[in-house]
A protein has these predicted regions:
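A donor-sugar binding/catalytic signature common to diverse glycosyltransferases
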Residues: 107-111, 129, 259-302
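Nucleotide-sugar donor-binding patch of glycosyltransferase catalytic domains
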Residues: 252-255, 288-335
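A short, glycine/small-residue-rich beta-strand->loop->alpha-helix junction that serves as a flexible
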Residues: 8-20
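C-terminal amphipathic helix plus adjacent low-complexity
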Residues: 327-359
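Conserved nucleotide-sugar donor-interacting segment of glycosyltransferase catalytic cores
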Residues: 95-158
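Conserved nucleotide-sugar phosphate-binding/catalytic loop shared by glycosyltransferases and other
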Residues: 10, 33-87
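Donor-nucleotide binding loops and adjacent catalytic segments primarily
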Residues: 23, 190-269
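A nucleotide-sugar donor-handling region in carbohydrate enzymes
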Residues: 138-139, 144-221
Length: 359
């Protein structure tokens, strides 16, 4: 029975959900597969996408960006953690090589902790990665803004990427030129489990009332201005925020069974920050997106640019979201600029097929 080891970056929820969609497709196509998932993401998040068995291996090989919420970054703490990993990389590599050999791993797939490429090389196991950007891309932008202490980290990550055997490059991507073998892939993500009619019945929502899903990833936002919802009594809002207030036109989704993508079929808008998984799943479902801008995070510009190309959208500033009156809900959505170039909607299928062909 083949064994595939999946390593997921220690940042937010989006990397976890998009790689989990690949694992779910694999398990559907091949039940005789040992799956190991190395991550610090909560187990419930994995289980919301996966129905098959897996070994939950709590490990962290990178940091991404340390944030207080989905928009605010702590660069100093990020640098400290990166330097710790870099200083202790030999020990981290040796420990994980021992684990890989003990579990007879045949293939490593990562999204997208760079150190895993070195771990795979030391273990003599092929390493494939998936992603739309590398962390060197994020940190290099900081270097160019004057944060020169990230320069050595950026070079280190680029060198690690060169050890990867194959990259599945997702839509909304930067060039990722540090990888030698690149295969472009379509949108990845989960598929909704319910129809619009089933969701309206289950949550007792009026089928003709306009609905907006408020979703901001695993890090959420500080102080979502819920008071603005009172200005739109004809709208039904939906949130996964556990701290949301009790409002007549706000439906709070509790527990971990449902995912944002499961609610998208009933929604006329998704209001979100720029994150790959939310935008990718919204594009797949075909629901328009109201997207906040995000300063200081270079991936956000690429994500927003891609959203404008491929989906109905409206781009708003954090100031309009936090301090404005939310009249963007009454504005006409912008049409996609390049609808004829929309990527394939089944990227997880292409990746799963390639993995199974290799095994």
């Amino acid at each position: 029975m083949p064994t595939v080891y999946f390593a997921i970056t220690n940042h937010g929820f989006g990397h976890t959900t998009r790689l989990s969609s690949v694992i779910a497709e694999l398990q559907t196509r091949c039940s005789e597969l040992n799956v190991i998932i190395a991550t610090t993401a909560p187990r419930w998040l994995l289980e919301s996408y996966l129905s098959g068995d897996f070994i939950y291996h709590q490990r962290s090989f990178d940091v991404g960006v340390i944030q207080s919420d989905s928009l605010n970054m702590d660069k100093a703490a990020t640098l400290d953690k990166l330097n710790y990993i870099r200083t202790n990389q030999s020990e981290l590599i040796a420990q994980e090589v021992e684990f890989l050999h003990a579990n007879h791993v045949d293939l490593i797939v990562a999204d997208i902790p760079p150190l895993v490429a070195a771990i795979a090389a030391a273990a003599d196991i092929p390493c494939w990665m998936t992603g739309n950007f590398g962390w060197d891309f994020i940190y290099q932008d900081w270097v160019e803004q004057g944060e020169i202490e990230f320069a050595e980290i950026t070079e280190w990550i680029s060198q690690l990427h060169s050890q990867c055997d194959r990259l599945f490059r997702l839509p909304f991507h930067e060039p990722m030129s540090g990888f030698d073998n690149i295969q472009d892939i379509g949108f990845t993500g989960g598929n909704p489990r319910f129809s619009r009619e089933e969701l309206c019945d289950r949550f007792e929502m009026c089928s003709i009332q306009p609905k907006a899903l408020l979703t901001f990833g695993g890090l959420s936002l500080n102080a979502i201005p819920y008071h603005n919802l009172a200005k739109f009594p004809d709208w039904q809002f939906i949130t996964f925020d556990r701290d949301a207030p009790d409002l007549p036109n706000l439906k709070q989704i509790c527990g971990h069974t449902l995912r944002p993508v499961d609610l998208m079929p009933v929604c006329d808008r998704v209001i979100s920050k720029p994150g790959y998984s939310t935008l990718s799943e919204a594009c797949r479902v075909g629901v328009p997106v109201v997207c906040l801008t995000r300063d200081g995070f270079s991936e956000a510009e690429i994500l927003i640019d891609g959203l404008q190309d491929y989906n109905h959208h409206l781009i708003v500033s954090p100031e309009d979201f936090y301090e404005g009156d939310w009249q963007f809900l009454n504005a006409d959505m912008q049409t996609p600029r390049r609808p004829e170039h929309v990527p394939d909607h089944h990227g997880e299928v292409a990746i799963a097929k390639t993995i199974l062909e290799y095994l």
